[in-house]
Swiss-Prot record:
Summary of the function given for this chain in its UniProt record: F(1)F(0) ATP synthase produces ATP from ADP in the presence of a proton or sodium gradient. F-type ATPases consist of two structural domains, F(1) containing the extramembraneous catalytic core and F(0) containing the membrane proton channel, linked together by a central stalk and a peripheral stalk. During catalysis, ATP synthesis in the catalytic domain of F(1) is coupled via a rotary mechanism of the central stalk subunits to proton translocation.
Subunit details: F-type ATPases have 2 components, F(1) - the catalytic core - and F(0) - the membrane proton channel. F(1) has five subunits: alpha(3), beta(3), gamma(1), delta(1), epsilon(1). CF(0) has four main subunits: a(1), b(1), b'(1) and c(10-14). The alpha and beta chains form an alternating ring which encloses part of the gamma chain. F(1) is attached to F(0) by a central stalk formed by the gamma and epsilon chains, while a peripheral stalk is formed by the delta, b and b' chains.
Keywords from the UniProt entry: ATP synthesis, CF(1), Hydrogen ion transport, Ion transport, Membrane, Thylakoid, Transport
Protein's cellular compartments: Cellular thylakoid membrane
Protein name (Swiss-Prot/TrEMBL): ATP synthase subunit delta
Family, per entry: Belongs to the ATPase delta chain family.
Gene Ontology molecular-function annotations: proton-transporting ATP synthase activity, rotational mechanism
Cleavable signal peptide: none
Length: 180
């Protein structure tokens, strides 16, 4: 059985190689972000691209219409290649993997932050600096979401590391220590 990374990695790495040759790593990263946000926002587009009964020419026409004026021409060629190879359904995963490669190249980490209330800009800055200190990264991409169940504080995930500074986590730790 083939893992998804075995499907995504060669295409993401090929796109990165083209980007590096042309000095367009960040531009292609922006295009990858556009794919991901567009696919997340449009179930119809996802279903259309995944539809095996549509001809490649139809899928290419849709991709050209949706992304043609927004993405770099080399990226549009890449999308057409994915259609030709019947891999366009994996676009989201390939784009995600490309962004991970770009973060690695730029020494940037992604931090998933859950908080009880929306974070202020000042709080985001504090978290960013703390994550930089902990990881030694040059930059941090913060993905935040609100989780009212936390009661207060934050949970920060960077890779496999989790820093639980939430009120819920503190109460759980107190409960465990009292039960012991």
């Amino acid at each position: 059985m083939t893992s998804t990374s075995q499907l995504f990695d060669p295409y993401a790495e090929a796109l990165m190689a083209i980007a590096r040759e042309q000095g367009l790593e960040d531009r292609f990263g922006e295009d990858a972000a556009l794919f991901r946000s567009t696919l997340a926002a449009s179930a119809d587009l996802r279903h259309l691209l995944e539809n095996p009964t549509l001809f490649s020419s139809q899928k290419k026409a849709v991709l050209n219409q949706v992304f043609g004026s927004s993405v770099h021409p080399l990226v549009l060629n890449f999308l057409n290649l994915l259609v030709d190879r019947n891999r366009i359904a994996f676009l989201d995963g390939i784009a995600d993997r490309y962004q991970a490669l770009l973060r690695k190249l730029r020494n940037v980490v992604r931090a998933d932050v859950s908080s009880a209330v929306p974070l202020t800009e000042a709080q985001v800055q504090v978290i960013t600096e703390k994550v930089k200190q902990l990881t030694g990264a040059a930059g941090v991409e913060i993905e935040s979401q609100v989780d009212a169940d936390l009661l207060g504080g934050v949970i920060i995930k960077v890779g496999s590391q989790v820093l639980d500074a939430s009120l819920r986590g503190q109460l759980k730790r107190i409960s465990i220590s009292l039960a012991a």
